[in-house]
Structure formats: C-alpha cells, structure tokens
A protein has these predicted regions:
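Conserved ATP-binding/catalytic motifs of P-loop helicase motor domains
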Residues: 1-204
Length: 204
C-alpha cells in the first residue's frame, strides 16, 4: 500500500483517494490504472474526468483511445444534465466532446453508437432532433409519463366546497396572500384530479 500511495500521489491523487482506489481494485490497482486510467472517473467517487485525463496523458495513453472518448462523452452529458436537463442533443454532445478531447467527430460518433448498442446510452429523436439520454433519466421520464397517463383516465371524487372562499379564509388567517397563478394551481388541484406544477429556481 505505501508504494501504491507514492505512485498515485505522483499524479496529484490525495491520500483518501488512494485508499478508495486500493479498496476498489486491491493490490493490482497500479496495473489496472496503467491499462485504463479512465476507470478512475467511472468507478471512484471524487475523481473526475480531468484527473483521469491528466493521468492518461502522463502515462502515454493514446488520446484517441475508446476509453478516453467514452469517458469524455459521459463527462459532457453528465455536466449538461447536472444543469437540470434530462437529455442532450446528439450534435451538441459531439461538438462539446470534440472541444474537450480534440479528437475527430467520427470517433465520437462511433463511440456514441457503440454505447447505444451496449445500452449504456439511449439515442432517440425528439422533434426530428437526435438526442442522447443517460438510461436512468430516460426510464425515469418514461415512468413519470406512464403514471400521469394512468392518473389522467381515473375517476376522482368531486369535492363540494367553495374553494375560492376557503382560499380567502386561509389568507386572512395566515396573513399569506397568494398570487393569481398560485390560486389557479390550488383550485386546479381540487377540480382537475391531477395537476402538474412546474417552476424554475426561486419560484417557490
């Protein structure tokens, strides 16, 4: 383990990260990482693509290797989804990955296709635009859609009450004044059976 620590710390890997690497890969960690340094950003929490790519460059990994390109694609898509998106237009994936890795577009496209065949990425057209999904986001959206479809055809018991009066009464008691759009949402929740409420940051 001490020899392993010295080796990885030479790449700027912290003591804690070294322990994680050893715990995951055991005594053969050095050989495993030398063969594919990009395994670090895929399997070790806290080690990102930039670190793995720096190690790859230092040990002479081919910049056009499939492992590097696949990891770069994953990084680009995850970064885009971290901003609140659930998929990324394929042409944007290719453009940003090319900018990140400085490799040919056809290599990126080929790796997207291979990831699709391996079911590691999902490619689907939305409004005639090819889009790339991480499977967990794709199936989450699909599940939500199916659930909403089921709920929308169910029969709901009608609530016989003056909702606007109840809202007004609540406002007086609580000192809270709802905006018109908020009142519409409350009324809709009582009258429509199902309601989808969306809003960006800071909308309450």
């Amino acid at each position: 383990l001490p020899i392993l620590m010295i080796y990885f710390q030479g790449f700027g890997i912290t003591h804690g990260q070294c322990l994680k690497i050893y715990k995951r890969f055991g005594p053969n960690a050095k050989e495993i990482v030398q063969k594919d340094p990009y395994i670090l950003c895929r399997e070790i929490k806290g080690i990102g693509f930039a670190t793995a790519d720096r190690i790859g460059s230092m040990i002479g990994i081919n910049r056009e290797s499939d492992s590097r390109i696949k990891s770069g694609i994953d990084f680009v898509i995850n970064r885009f989804c971290a901003a609140g998106n659930t998929y990324m237009p394929k042409n944007k994936v290719i453009e940003e990955t090319k900018e990140l890795l400085l490799v040919k577009e056809e290599l990126i496209e080929g790796n997207i296709y291979n990831a699709f065949l391996e079911k590691k990425l999902i490619v689907q057209k939305i409004n005639d635009i090819e889009c790339v999904f991480i499977p967990i986001f794709y199936y989450s959206e699909l599940g939500i859609t199916e659930r909403i479809a089921r709920l929308s055809i169910q029969n709901y018991q009608t609530i016989n009450t003056d909702i606007e009066f109840e809202i007004s009464l609540f406002e007086k008691k609580s000192g809270i004044n709802f905006a018109d759009s908020q009142k519409e949402a409350i009324i809709g929740a009582f009258t429509d059976g199902i309601e989808i409420i969306t809003g960006g940051p800071g909308t309450g």
